[in-house]
Amino acid sequence: MAHEMMGGFFGHPPPPPATAAVGEEEDEVVEETEEGGHGGGVQGKLCARGHWRPAEDAKLKDLVAQYGPQNWNLIAEKLDGRSGKSCRLRWFNQLDPRINRRAFTEEEEERLMAAHRAYGNKWALIARLFPGRTDNAVKNHWHVLMARRHREQSGAFRRRKPSSSSASPAPAPAPPPPPQPVVALHHHHHRYSQQYSGYSGAAESDESASTCTTDLSLSSGSAAAAAAAAAAANIPCCFYQSTPRASSSSTAACRAPRVAAAADTVAFFPGAGYDFAAAPHAMAPAAASTFAPSARSAFSAPAGRGEPPGAVDQRGGAQATTDSHTIPFFDFLGVGAT
Protein backbone atom coordinates (compact mmCIF):
# COMPACT_ATOMS: atom_id res chain seq x y z
CA MET A 1 0.00 0.00 0.00
CA ALA A 2 2.77 2.33 0.92
CA HIS A 3 4.55 1.38 -2.29
CA GLU A 4 1.51 2.30 -4.34
CA MET A 5 1.21 5.64 -2.52
CA MET A 6 4.84 6.43 -3.18
CA GLY A 7 4.40 5.45 -6.81
CA GLY A 8 1.36 7.70 -7.14
CA PHE A 9 3.09 10.59 -5.43
CA PHE A 10 6.23 10.53 -7.56
CA GLY A 11 4.39 9.57 -10.73
CA HIS A 12 4.38 6.43 -12.78
CA PRO A 13 7.67 4.56 -13.13
CA PRO A 14 9.35 4.73 -16.54
CA PRO A 15 8.31 2.03 -18.98
CA PRO A 16 10.77 -0.79 -19.63
CA PRO A 17 13.00 -0.38 -22.72
CA ALA A 18 11.49 -1.71 -25.91
CA THR A 19 13.07 -4.78 -27.40
CA ALA A 20 15.09 -4.33 -30.56
CA ALA A 21 13.53 -5.29 -33.82
CA VAL A 22 14.49 -8.47 -35.52
CA GLY A 23 17.68 -8.17 -37.58
CA GLU A 24 19.07 -5.11 -35.71
CA GLU A 25 22.01 -5.39 -33.35
CA GLU A 26 24.21 -3.06 -31.35
CA ASP A 27 27.55 -1.85 -32.67
CA GLU A 28 29.78 -3.29 -29.97
CA VAL A 29 28.22 -6.72 -29.55
CA VAL A 30 30.62 -9.24 -28.14
CA GLU A 31 28.15 -11.83 -26.92
CA GLU A 32 24.98 -12.31 -28.97
CA THR A 33 21.86 -13.75 -27.29
CA GLU A 34 19.33 -15.76 -29.19
CA GLU A 35 16.02 -17.26 -28.14
CA GLY A 36 15.74 -21.00 -28.63
CA GLY A 37 13.56 -23.92 -27.48
CA HIS A 38 10.04 -23.85 -26.09
CA GLY A 39 11.06 -22.58 -22.67
CA GLY A 40 12.47 -19.33 -24.04
CA GLY A 41 15.95 -20.04 -22.70
CA VAL A 42 18.84 -17.74 -23.62
CA GLN A 43 21.91 -19.12 -25.32
CA GLY A 44 25.15 -17.07 -25.67
CA LYS A 45 27.34 -16.92 -28.84
CA LEU A 46 30.86 -15.54 -29.02
CA CYS A 47 31.62 -13.53 -32.21
CA ALA A 48 34.98 -13.15 -33.86
CA ARG A 49 36.24 -9.67 -34.72
CA GLY A 50 39.07 -10.50 -37.11
CA HIS A 51 39.37 -9.91 -40.85
CA TRP A 52 37.12 -11.82 -43.18
CA ARG A 53 38.82 -14.74 -44.86
CA PRO A 54 38.17 -15.72 -48.49
CA ALA A 55 36.43 -18.92 -47.38
CA GLU A 56 34.04 -16.90 -45.21
CA ASP A 57 33.30 -14.51 -48.10
CA ALA A 58 32.44 -17.41 -50.40
CA LYS A 59 30.15 -19.00 -47.80
CA LEU A 60 28.42 -15.64 -47.15
CA LYS A 61 27.66 -15.26 -50.85
CA ASP A 62 26.09 -18.72 -50.93
CA LEU A 63 23.96 -18.01 -47.86
CA VAL A 64 22.75 -14.66 -49.24
CA ALA A 65 21.82 -16.34 -52.50
CA GLN A 66 19.92 -18.98 -50.52
CA TYR A 67 18.18 -16.87 -47.84
CA GLY A 68 18.21 -13.40 -49.38
CA PRO A 69 19.95 -10.19 -48.24
CA GLN A 70 17.61 -9.58 -45.27
CA ASN A 71 17.70 -12.63 -42.96
CA TRP A 72 21.04 -11.79 -41.37
CA ASN A 73 20.48 -13.57 -38.05
CA LEU A 74 19.65 -16.77 -39.89
CA ILE A 75 22.70 -16.35 -42.08
CA ALA A 76 24.89 -15.66 -39.02
CA GLU A 77 23.84 -19.02 -37.53
CA LYS A 78 25.52 -20.74 -40.47
CA LEU A 79 28.79 -18.75 -40.00
CA ASP A 80 30.69 -19.64 -36.87
CA GLY A 81 31.99 -16.58 -35.01
CA ARG A 82 30.10 -13.96 -37.11
CA SER A 83 27.14 -11.86 -36.04
CA GLY A 84 24.21 -10.75 -38.17
CA LYS A 85 25.45 -7.15 -38.26
CA SER A 86 28.91 -8.21 -39.34
CA CYS A 87 27.45 -10.27 -42.19
CA ARG A 88 25.24 -7.38 -43.31
CA LEU A 89 28.06 -4.81 -43.37
CA ARG A 90 30.34 -7.20 -45.19
CA TRP A 91 27.74 -7.80 -47.84
CA PHE A 92 26.65 -4.21 -48.53
CA ASN A 93 30.18 -2.71 -48.39
CA GLN A 94 32.23 -5.36 -50.16
CA LEU A 95 30.35 -8.32 -51.67
CA ASP A 96 27.19 -6.82 -53.17
CA PRO A 97 27.38 -7.19 -56.98
CA ARG A 98 25.51 -3.88 -57.39
CA ILE A 99 28.47 -1.89 -56.00
CA ASN A 100 30.03 0.45 -58.55
CA ARG A 101 33.76 -0.25 -58.37
CA ARG A 102 34.80 2.02 -61.22
CA ALA A 103 36.89 5.11 -60.60
CA PHE A 104 35.13 8.38 -59.87
CA THR A 105 34.68 10.60 -62.89
CA GLU A 106 35.29 14.35 -62.90
CA GLU A 107 31.55 14.97 -62.89
CA GLU A 108 31.12 12.72 -59.83
CA GLU A 109 34.00 14.46 -58.08
CA GLU A 110 32.39 17.87 -58.63
CA ARG A 111 29.08 16.56 -57.32
CA LEU A 112 30.84 15.04 -54.32
CA MET A 113 32.53 18.35 -53.44
CA ALA A 114 29.23 20.23 -53.79
CA ALA A 115 27.36 17.64 -51.68
CA HIS A 116 29.99 17.84 -48.95
CA ARG A 117 29.69 21.64 -48.88
CA ALA A 118 25.93 21.23 -48.50
CA TYR A 119 25.67 18.29 -46.04
CA GLY A 120 29.05 18.11 -44.34
CA ASN A 121 30.24 14.69 -43.14
CA LYS A 122 26.87 12.94 -43.49
CA TRP A 123 28.28 10.23 -45.74
CA ALA A 124 25.23 7.95 -45.66
CA LEU A 125 23.08 10.83 -46.93
CA ILE A 126 25.64 11.77 -49.57
CA ALA A 127 25.95 8.15 -50.74
CA ARG A 128 22.27 8.16 -51.70
CA LEU A 129 23.11 10.76 -54.36
CA PHE A 130 25.53 8.30 -55.99
CA PRO A 131 23.81 5.05 -56.99
CA GLY A 132 26.14 2.10 -56.64
CA ARG A 133 28.50 4.00 -54.30
CA THR A 134 28.72 3.09 -50.65
CA ASP A 135 29.15 5.58 -47.86
CA ASN A 136 32.67 4.29 -47.15
CA ALA A 137 33.65 4.67 -50.81
CA VAL A 138 32.29 8.23 -50.92
CA LYS A 139 34.10 9.19 -47.71
CA ASN A 140 37.42 7.66 -48.79
CA HIS A 141 37.36 9.36 -52.19
CA TRP A 142 36.63 12.75 -50.62
CA HIS A 143 39.78 12.42 -48.50
CA VAL A 144 41.71 11.48 -51.64
CA LEU A 145 40.50 14.68 -53.34
CA MET A 146 41.54 16.81 -50.37
CA ALA A 147 45.03 15.29 -50.30
CA ARG A 148 45.42 15.81 -54.06
CA ARG A 149 44.38 19.46 -53.83
CA HIS A 150 46.79 20.06 -50.95
CA ARG A 151 49.68 18.58 -52.95
CA GLU A 152 48.85 20.73 -55.97
CA GLN A 153 48.70 23.93 -53.92
CA SER A 154 51.96 23.21 -52.11
CA GLY A 155 53.68 22.30 -55.41
CA ALA A 156 52.45 25.48 -57.10
CA PHE A 157 53.72 27.51 -54.15
CA ARG A 158 57.16 25.89 -54.37
CA ARG A 159 57.32 26.53 -58.13
CA ARG A 160 56.13 30.12 -57.75
CA LYS A 161 58.58 31.02 -54.98
CA PRO A 162 61.85 30.52 -56.97
CA SER A 163 60.38 32.18 -60.08
CA SER A 164 59.31 35.25 -58.12
CA SER A 165 62.72 35.54 -56.49
CA SER A 166 64.52 35.20 -59.84
CA ALA A 167 62.19 37.69 -61.55
CA SER A 168 63.11 40.48 -59.16
CA PRO A 169 65.93 42.55 -60.69
CA ALA A 170 69.24 42.47 -58.92
CA PRO A 171 70.42 45.82 -57.53
CA ALA A 172 72.84 47.58 -59.84
CA PRO A 173 76.37 47.92 -58.45
CA ALA A 174 77.40 51.37 -57.34
CA PRO A 175 79.53 53.26 -59.88
CA PRO A 176 83.22 53.49 -58.97
CA PRO A 177 84.38 56.85 -57.58
CA PRO A 178 86.16 59.19 -60.01
CA PRO A 179 89.95 58.93 -59.98
CA GLN A 180 91.68 61.45 -57.75
CA PRO A 181 95.10 63.03 -58.45
CA VAL A 182 97.80 61.26 -56.51
CA VAL A 183 100.31 63.44 -54.68
CA ALA A 184 103.19 61.47 -53.18
CA LEU A 185 105.32 62.86 -50.40
CA HIS A 186 108.81 61.35 -50.37
CA HIS A 187 110.92 61.69 -47.27
CA HIS A 188 114.61 61.38 -48.00
CA HIS A 189 117.20 60.97 -45.28
CA HIS A 190 120.70 61.96 -46.36
CA ARG A 191 123.86 61.58 -44.35
CA TYR A 192 126.83 63.77 -44.48
CA SER A 193 129.94 62.34 -46.03
CA GLN A 194 133.26 62.33 -44.30
CA GLN A 195 134.29 65.65 -45.85
CA TYR A 196 131.33 67.47 -44.19
CA SER A 197 130.93 65.61 -40.91
CA GLY A 198 134.57 65.02 -40.07
CA TYR A 199 134.01 61.49 -38.84
CA SER A 200 132.83 58.29 -40.47
CA GLY A 201 131.85 55.73 -37.83
CA ALA A 202 129.72 58.01 -35.68
CA ALA A 203 128.02 59.67 -38.65
CA GLU A 204 125.83 56.64 -39.39
CA SER A 205 124.58 56.26 -35.82
CA ASP A 206 124.23 59.96 -35.12
CA GLU A 207 120.59 60.84 -35.55
CA SER A 208 121.29 64.54 -35.41
CA ALA A 209 123.56 64.35 -38.46
CA SER A 210 120.76 63.27 -40.77
CA THR A 211 118.78 65.91 -42.62
CA CYS A 212 115.14 65.71 -43.55
CA THR A 213 113.77 66.88 -46.84
CA THR A 214 110.25 66.76 -48.15
CA ASP A 215 109.97 66.25 -51.89
CA LEU A 216 106.56 67.04 -53.43
CA SER A 217 106.43 64.94 -56.60
CA LEU A 218 103.72 65.64 -59.15
CA SER A 219 105.17 63.72 -62.09
CA SER A 220 108.52 62.47 -63.27
CA GLY A 221 108.37 64.64 -66.39
CA SER A 222 107.81 67.89 -64.49
CA ALA A 223 110.62 67.06 -62.03
CA ALA A 224 113.07 66.40 -64.86
CA ALA A 225 112.05 69.62 -66.63
CA ALA A 226 112.51 71.61 -63.42
CA ALA A 227 115.99 70.16 -62.86
CA ALA A 228 117.04 70.91 -66.45
CA ALA A 229 115.79 74.50 -66.29
CA ALA A 230 117.50 75.10 -62.96
CA ALA A 231 120.80 73.70 -64.25
CA ALA A 232 120.60 75.92 -67.36
CA ALA A 233 119.99 79.03 -65.23
CA ASN A 234 122.68 78.07 -62.67
CA ILE A 235 120.02 78.15 -59.94
CA PRO A 236 119.21 75.22 -57.66
CA CYS A 237 115.73 73.79 -58.00
CA CYS A 238 114.93 74.41 -54.34
CA PHE A 239 116.39 76.95 -51.93
CA TYR A 240 116.18 76.39 -48.20
CA GLN A 241 116.75 79.07 -45.65
CA SER A 242 119.65 77.93 -43.54
CA THR A 243 119.24 77.76 -39.81
CA PRO A 244 122.30 77.67 -37.55
CA ARG A 245 122.62 74.55 -35.44
CA ALA A 246 123.21 76.06 -32.04
CA SER A 247 122.76 72.85 -30.10
CA SER A 248 121.75 69.23 -30.47
CA SER A 249 118.13 70.25 -29.97
CA SER A 250 118.10 71.42 -33.58
CA THR A 251 117.39 67.82 -34.59
CA ALA A 252 113.81 68.46 -33.55
CA ALA A 253 113.38 70.34 -36.81
CA CYS A 254 113.41 66.98 -38.60
CA ARG A 255 110.52 65.81 -36.49
CA ALA A 256 108.53 69.05 -36.75
CA PRO A 257 105.39 69.11 -38.90
CA ARG A 258 105.95 69.43 -42.57
CA VAL A 259 103.93 72.67 -42.54
CA ALA A 260 106.72 74.45 -40.64
CA ALA A 261 109.31 73.11 -43.08
CA ALA A 262 107.22 74.27 -46.00
CA ALA A 263 106.89 77.76 -44.49
CA ASP A 264 110.70 78.17 -44.45
CA THR A 265 111.10 76.84 -47.98
CA VAL A 266 111.14 78.93 -51.13
CA ALA A 267 110.79 76.77 -54.23
CA PHE A 268 110.86 77.69 -57.88
CA PHE A 269 109.35 75.42 -60.54
CA PRO A 270 109.07 75.97 -64.31
CA GLY A 271 105.79 77.43 -65.41
CA ALA A 272 105.15 79.27 -62.11
CA GLY A 273 105.77 82.73 -63.57
CA TYR A 274 109.48 82.91 -62.78
CA ASP A 275 111.91 84.09 -65.46
CA PHE A 276 114.90 81.77 -65.24
CA ALA A 277 116.79 83.70 -67.97
CA ALA A 278 116.76 86.91 -65.95
CA ALA A 279 117.36 85.18 -62.63
CA PRO A 280 121.15 85.78 -62.39
CA HIS A 281 120.68 89.52 -63.07
CA ALA A 282 117.66 89.98 -60.87
CA MET A 283 119.04 88.36 -57.73
CA ALA A 284 121.26 90.44 -55.51
CA PRO A 285 124.39 89.03 -53.89
CA ALA A 286 122.79 89.49 -50.49
CA ALA A 287 119.74 87.51 -51.54
CA ALA A 288 121.93 84.84 -53.04
CA SER A 289 123.90 84.59 -49.84
CA THR A 290 120.71 84.47 -47.84
CA PHE A 291 119.18 81.55 -49.73
CA ALA A 292 122.40 79.68 -50.54
CA PRO A 293 122.57 76.41 -48.55
CA SER A 294 125.61 75.88 -46.38
CA ALA A 295 127.47 72.74 -45.52
CA ARG A 296 126.04 72.62 -41.98
CA SER A 297 122.50 73.63 -42.81
CA ALA A 298 119.64 71.81 -41.18
CA PHE A 299 118.04 71.43 -44.58
CA SER A 300 119.86 70.44 -47.72
CA ALA A 301 118.76 70.19 -51.32
CA PRO A 302 118.17 66.59 -52.48
CA ALA A 303 121.06 65.21 -54.48
CA GLY A 304 120.62 63.27 -57.67
CA ARG A 305 120.70 59.49 -57.81
CA GLY A 306 124.27 58.25 -57.48
CA GLU A 307 125.69 61.73 -56.75
CA PRO A 308 127.42 62.91 -53.54
CA PRO A 309 125.79 65.62 -51.48
CA GLY A 310 128.29 68.19 -52.82
CA ALA A 311 127.01 67.84 -56.38
CA VAL A 312 124.18 70.25 -55.68
CA ASP A 313 126.61 72.93 -54.57
CA GLN A 314 128.69 72.38 -57.73
CA ARG A 315 125.61 72.89 -59.89
CA GLY A 316 124.74 75.98 -57.87
CA GLY A 317 127.87 77.79 -59.13
CA ALA A 318 129.08 80.93 -57.46
CA GLN A 319 126.18 81.06 -55.01
CA ALA A 320 127.58 78.07 -53.09
CA THR A 321 131.25 79.18 -53.21
CA THR A 322 130.62 82.80 -52.23
CA ASP A 323 128.75 81.98 -49.05
CA SER A 324 129.68 84.89 -46.80
CA HIS A 325 127.42 83.77 -43.96
CA THR A 326 129.80 81.76 -41.80
CA ILE A 327 128.29 79.39 -39.24
CA PRO A 328 130.34 78.66 -36.13
CA PHE A 329 131.20 75.01 -35.53
CA PHE A 330 130.53 73.50 -32.12
CA ASP A 331 132.42 70.34 -31.32
CA PHE A 332 129.97 68.47 -29.07
CA LEU A 333 131.49 65.03 -29.57
CA GLY A 334 135.12 66.08 -29.19
CA VAL A 335 136.29 64.72 -32.51
CA GLY A 336 137.83 67.96 -33.68
CA ALA A 337 137.22 70.07 -36.76
CA THR A 338 138.49 68.95 -40.18
Curated annotation (Swiss-Prot):
Name of this protein: Transcription factor CSA
Residue spans of biased composition, Pro residues class: 170-181
DNA-binding region: 72-94, 123-146
The keyword Nucleus belongs to this UniProt entry's keyword annotation: yes
SUPFAM superfamilies: Homeodomain-like (SSF46689)
Gene: CSA
Any one biological process term the GO annotation gives: regulation of DNA-templated transcription
Subcellular location: Nucleus
One GO location term (cellular component): nucleus
InterPro entries, A to Z: Homeodomain-like_sf, Myb_dom, MYB_TF, SANT/Myb
Membrane-spanning intervals of the chain: none
SMART domains xrefs: SANT
Tissue: Expressed in root vascular tissue, primordia of lateral roots, leaf collar, and veins of lemma, palea and pistil.
Ranges for domain HTH myb-type: 44-95, 96-150
Pfam families assigned to the protein according to its UniProt record, in alphabetical order: Myb_DNA-bind_6
Basic residues bias locations: 150-162
Region annotated Disordered, chain positions: 1-25, 150-184, 298-322
Induction: Induced by wounding.
